Amino acid sequence: LLLHLEAGLEQAGLHAPQWLEACARALFDTACQQAWGVDGEPGFVYTLDWANRPVVHARLHWVHAEACAAAAALLLRTGEAQYEQWYRNCWGFIANHFIDPVGGSWHHELDAHNQPAGTLWPGKPDLYHAYQALLLPGLPLAPSLASNLAGNVTKR
């Protein structure tokens, strides 16, 4: 979101503070370093305590979908290969664990061993985050997702 704000400000001819990119990088990089595979299993654990120890070991679909979108935005903004690698890592994890080829849709939650679970919230999620993870990487950082999509809709 910080990179979308930066791009939107620039598109509007307004000053975009340098800290927007720096903070976007720091947030993403820290999440990858502290939360991915921290308990010995791949994927982002849901929560960490103040000492960066896992509190909730579950993996939630929306966290991984948002990570894909963030990695794609950082790749678009910086061109740095590490963000493409994270994008691919996240999508590989989603494809192997969250997408349900039998029942359709995505599993909302995985347990600490990356098996479908329903401890935090049972059932299938809405597709809001999944759609964003699919659509955002193919769009520019500005204008917004809604504006980008609206500009490509044919009125009947």
Predicted regions and their residues:
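Glycan-recognition and catalytic cores of secretory/periplasmic carbohydrate-active enzymes
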Residues: 1-156
